Amino acid sequence: MSSKRAKTKTTKKRPQRATSNVFAMFDQSQIQEFKEAFNMIDQNRDGFIDKEDLHDMLASLGKNPTDEYLDAMMNEAPGPINFTMFLTMFGEKLNGTDPEDVIRNAFACFDEEATGFIQEDYLRELLTTMGDRFTDEEVDELYREAPIDKKGNFNYIEFTRILKHGAKDKDD
């Protein structure tokens, strides 16, 4: 009994609180997708992602990672990478990169009237002709769940919120 209490005290330190917040950050379907990704990387199915798992996964994608590269990736984790740590690391990355205002400002460059909307046809043209060009099929996929009103206005402020926090629950 006393050893269980000692273990319980050990697990209640800061990392445990951080991970519980991470689970609250994602909805159940997102967690399931992360679990599937974790299982694909965990090649030896031991419940942990190690250097060999990373190497095998990257090799299966046609990459030939160096030991230094793999070590750098492994060193981003403060300890063994189980699913909870994996989710925590993704949560930190998702929160730490491309803040909402950066995404919003990227869209705002094409919203001369500062309305929060871009005409869907204009956005399609931009996405298929500039930068890393989308195919029409990719734009169709984007628009399937995008906040577009009946007048064809793409609500990029709401879209940015969806990107960062997920879609609002709907009863299917």
Swiss-Prot record:
Gene3D superfamilies: EF-hand
UniProt xrefs under InterPro entries: EF-hand-dom_pair, EF_Hand_1_Ca_BS, EF_hand_dom, Myosin_RLC
Molecular function per GO: calcium ion binding; myosin heavy chain binding
Record PTM Phosphothreonine, positions in chain: T19
Keyword entries, A-Z: Acetylation, Calcium, Metal-binding, Motor protein, Muscle protein, Myosin, Phosphoprotein, Repeat
Other noteworthy facts: This chain binds calcium.
Function: Myosin regulatory subunit that plays an important role in regulation of both smooth muscle and nonmuscle cell contractile activity. Implicated in cytokinesis, receptor capping, and cell locomotion.
Protein name according to UniProt: Myosin regulatory light chain 2, smooth muscle minor isoform
Organism: Gallus gallus (Chicken)
